[in-house]
UniProtKB/Swiss-Prot annotation:
Subcellular locations according to the entry: Cell outer membrane
TBDR beta-barrel domain boundaries: 185-921
SUPFAM superfamilies xrefs: Porins (SSF56935)
Keyword Zinc assigned: no
UniProt function note: Probable receptor, TonB-dependent.
Organism in which the protein naturally occurs: Neisseria meningitidis serogroup B (strain ATCC BAA-335 / MC58)
GO cellular component, one term: cell outer membrane
Protein name per the record: Probable TonB-dependent receptor NMB1497
Family of this protein: Belongs to the TonB-dependent receptor family.
Length: 921
């Protein structure tokens, strides 16, 4: 209640200012020519006239921008990865784009926005039991509608700094100006793309109209429609093998070995059939010796069934199932814009409907922006937005190998209201002060249409009765022994952010001082399942007269597993300050310091494998202290009158306290009450999100350079980073179909993936223009240095060493996942030719991965997936392999009678030819 009282005075003040000045504007308009005209003295202002795509080289922050993305043939992942310090969490099954800044990703670590509106969608993919599934935050937006991307690293201002730990990224969608040229009344924008190597069709059309009014204002309207198809059974580099068939030959050789060694069979290549190997002793003894053809056929079929059900999954190293990753999407964009003398507003609707395999993703976005600009002291901006996301899973969809018994639907709804005013003051001694005061209300909600009890860890059904864990005797039991409900898929809950923010920019001569601050009040509530072994235990927890007890009380059953809610609140203050100077075109230095926070998410606080064992609402907010130093260079006329040079170099150091990750260990207060079902079953360990005890340190530098001579141009980006950020226990898991019963308790459900950036990475582009700039020829080189991925092996933390203990008062062990280093990838070269026979009609042909190199994309979800291991005993001297294996012997520890061996088959796309056409008229 206290925050609402604070809000009222500011809201009334801003509303009063708005109404007063709006009335003033109307009166001034009616006065017309009667108004007196005041003649001001001439004011001479010298300022750099910098093109939009070059402004980053004069901005005293660690910022990057990319323009005209809708014209590009590059996918959004590659565009983001061309920005130093920025990356993406690539996932073929997510249907979204998930941005990474300096090794941090996800809601709150990176404030990913579309047209200034924070994106909160949480994508969760299904899995038949091989890879383990995946989940991640991101933006559901069609790149055909994106006009530009702005990335801010390590600092903040305005509403972009709300719940933003590492920085922000804003995807700007098309506006009327992008479609209607100059003073034209109508405009049309077309784009189409096709190609080889499983590149499907991609097309977009947008139409716009603008009408100029007598007052000088304009009204514009825009509608766009986009469709695309995505196929994933591409050919990898270095041989042309399809990714979906990778490892098939190896699997076939393993099958033959099994038939020969265990079945005493041999393959007759002439008949194409298996037959008895009469040289083997087995066929000399009864009953085998008297087998007729029918009995032999049955014998072969039994071996084939045993291979398919028990052994083939252990040797299957196919990285993906392309048939389950076929993607089709259709999107719409509608905008209505009014641009007046004093007032501006934009109303927009955007949707994207995506189907990936059997899963449907439906996103709807509504937004209204209003601006009132009257004088230097009144520049009022109002933004209201509503985002809705749905994921629909049909009956039979599987999560970590366990199927849904009924249709299942999850949803995410977000409401945002932002109000701010900017004032500019002319101070003595040629000093200028600009301030912005604002308030932001943000409500974010996650929910589902039902509680899927069939996904519970100990649920007993047909899908649970398979795999190695079932063969060895899995953990199971009725309500009298174990909680039956789990919150592993889409935890439900709500978040409320109430934020006051203030920006100030002081400018004098060549110096500039910027300061931004905000205070965030955070309230949350989420669902979890309780477990009470008796009526008395339930009564003691809530009281006999409580609504909860009355709602769930059932004296006949004696065991209670109610779905309950738990609430909490937190608060944080954030600051960002920077100082810069403009000593000339060649040297514009800047330095900044920021303290930022990230609030725990619903998924971190309410995920739970068993009952409420994973619930942890006492998580502390993450806190980052970031120092940055850098300089800009922007010079026009370096070697000739109209060439331009842009350079930005930034070094940074960051320390993060209370880093949130999930660990495997005991979750209860060791000095408090021990859960009754723990003491009776001995199942003392589970996955829970916790604050990392050590501080996380990051440091690195980022370079961005652009030189344009006219005939010749080049772009260079390069980033280097070292980080001590820990992994999550859920970053890698055993394959569900091959897990032992112990490993079934350690399934990570695809909750997370490694997010640490490659040690270094970069991109160099060189091009030249001919035929009066109608023909552009160019090429780009992509470089990825050493990177890491998670393995299934455990790393013990918090002073533990892996020793188990039956004493429930002792910590025992806490573990996350080990990592292994992926070597520097080969250089990847792309080539393109663009021809513009008439203005704004562009044909572009290009070759991706020109030399057909075989390489791995860093931070691809498939790198950490369970498909990148095979699960069986093996002979280390065995050379019958066609996969790249890790030589680290610590990964082959023979646990549970077998070995988890690491492989590398998740290769990126090989040589691909693309053709793009875009036309604007």
């Amino acid at each position: 209640m206290r925050s609402s009282f604070r809000l009222k005075p500011i809201c009334f003040y801003l509303m009063g200012v708005t109404l007063y000045h709006y009335s003033y504007a109307e009166d001034a308009g009616r006065a017309g020519s009667e108004a007196q005209i005041q003649v001001l003295e001439d004011v001479h202002v010298k300022a750099k006239r910098v093109p939009k795509d070059k402004k980053v080289f004069t901005d005293a922050r660690a910022v990057s921008t990319r323009q005209d993305i809708f014209k590009s043939s590059e996918n959004l992942d590659n565009i983001v990865r061309s920005i130093p310090g920025a990356f993406t969490q690539q996932d073929k099954s997510s249907g979204i784009v998930s941005l990474n800044i300096r090794g941090d990703s996800g809601f709150g670590r990176v404030n990913t926005m579309v047209d200034g509106i924070t994106q909160t969608f949480y994508s969760t993919s299904t899995d038949a039991g091989r890879a383990g599934g995946s989940s991640q935050f991101g933006a559901s937006v069609d790149s055909n509608f994106i006009a530009g991307l702005d990335v801010v690293k390590g600092s903040f201002s305005g509403s972009a700094g709300i719940n933003s730990l590492a920085g922000s990224a804003n995807l700007r969608t098309l506006g009327v100006d992008d479609v209607v040229q100059g003073n034209n009344t109508y405009g049309l924008l077309l784009k189409g793309l096709t190609g080889t190597n499983s590149t499907k069709g991609n097309a977009m059309a947008a139409i716009g109209a603008r009408k100029w009014l007598e007052s000088g204002a304009s009204v514009g309207v825009l509608y766009g429609h986009s469709r695309r198809s995505v196929a994933q059974n591409y050919r990898v580099g270095g041989g042309g093998q399809h990714i979906g068939n990778f490892g098939a030959e190896y699997l076939e050789r393993r099958k033959q070995r099994y038939f020969v060694q265990e079945g005493a069979l041999k393959f007759n290549s002439d008949s194409g059939k298996w037959e008895r190997d009469l040289q083997r002793q087995q066929w000399k003894y009864k009953p085998y010796k008297n087998y007729n053809n029918q009995e032999l056929q049955k014998y072969i079929e039994e071996h084939d069934k045993s291979w398919r059900e028990n052994l083939a999954p252990q040797y299957d190293i196919t990285p993906i199932d392309p048939s389950s990753l076929k993607q089709q999407s259709a999107g719409n964009l509608f905008k209505l814009e009014y641009d007046g003398v004093f007032n501006k507003y934009t109303a927009q609707f955007r949707d994207l409907n995506t189907k990936i395999g059997s899963r449907k993703i439906i996103n709807r976005n509504y937004q209204f922006n209003y601006g009132l600009s009257l004088n230097p002291y009144t520049n009022l901006n109002l933004t209201a937005a509503y985002n809705s996301g749905r994921q629909k899973y049909p009956k039979g969809s599987k999560f970590t190998g366990w199927g849904l018994l009924k249709d299942f639907e999850t949803y995410n709804n977000a409401k945002i209201l932002d109000l701010n005013n900017t004032a500019t003051f002319r101070l003595p001694r040629e000093t200028e002060l600009q301030t912005t005061l604002g308030f932001n209300y943000f409500h974010n909600e996650y929910g589902k249409n039902r509680f899927p009890e069939e996904l519970g860890l100990f649920f007993d059904g047909p899908d649970q009765d398979n795999g190695l864990y079932s063969y060895l005797g899995r953990f199971k039991g009725d309500k009298g022994l174990l909680p039956q409900k789990s919150t592993i898929v889409q935890p439900a809950g709500s978040q409320y952010f109430n934020t006051f923010y203030f920006d100030a920019a002081l400018k004098k001569d060549i110096y500039r001082l910027n300061y931004s601050t905000n205070t965030v009040g955070y309230r949350f509530g989420g669902e979890y399942t309780g477990y009470y072994g008796s009526d008395d235990e339930f009564k003691r927890a809530f009281g006999e007269n409580s609504p909860t007890y009355k709602k769930h009380c059932n004296r006949s059953c004696g065991i209670y597993e109610p779905v309950l809610k738990k609430y909490g609140k937190k608060r944080a203050n954030n600051h960002s300050v920077s100082i810069s100077a403009d000593f000339g075109d060649y040297f514009m230095p800047f330095a900044s310091y920021s303290r930022t926070h990230r609030m725990p998410n619903i998924q971190e606080m309410y995920f739970s494998q068993i009952g409420d064992s994973g619930v942890h609402t006492a998580l502390k907010p993450e806190r980052a202290n970031t120092w940055q130093f850098g300089f800009n260079t922007y010079k026009k006329g370096l070697l000739k009158q109209d060439d331009t040079l842009g350079l930005k170099l930034v070094g940074y150091r960051s320390r993060i306290d209370n880093y949130i990750h999930n660990v495997y260990g005991k979750w209860w207060d060791l000095n408090g009450d021990i859960p009754s079902w723990v003491s009776s079953t001995g199942l003392a360990y589970t996955i829970q999100h916790r604050n990392f005890k050590d501080k996380v340190h990051k440091h690195g530098f980022e370079l961005e350079l652009n030189y344009d001579y006219g005939r010749f141009f080049t772009n260079l980006s390069y980033a280097y980073q070292k980080s001590t950020q820990p992994t999550n226990f859920s970053d890698a898991s055993e394959s569900p179909n091959n897990a032992s019963k112990e490993d079934q308790l350690k399934q990570g459900y695809g909750l997370s993936r490694v997010s640490a950036l490659p040690r270094d990475y970069g991109r160099l582009e060189v091009g030249t223009r001919w035929l009066g700039n109608k023909l552009t020829l160019g090429g780009a080189m992509r470089y990825f240095g050493k990177s890491i991925r998670a393995t299934a092996e455990e790393r013990y933390i918090d002073g533990t060493n892996g020793g188990n203990t039956s004493n429930f008062r002792q910590l025992g062990k806490r573990s996350i996942k080990q990592t292994e280093t992926l070597a520097r990838q080969p250089l990847i070269f792309d080539f393109y030719a663009a021809y513009e026979p008439k203005k704004n009609l562009i044909f572009r042909a290009e070759v991706k991965n020109l030399f057909d190199r075989r390489y791995i994309d860093p931070l691809d979800a498939g790198n950490d997936a369970a498909t990148q291991r095979y699960y069986s005993s093996f002979d280390p001297k065995d050379k019958d392999e066609d996969v790249t294996c890790n030589a680290d012997k610590t990964l082959c520890n023979g646990k549970y009678g077998g070995t988890s061996k690491s492989v590398l088959t998740n290769f990126a796309r090989g040589r691909t030819f693309l053709m793009t056409m875009s036309y604007k008229f």
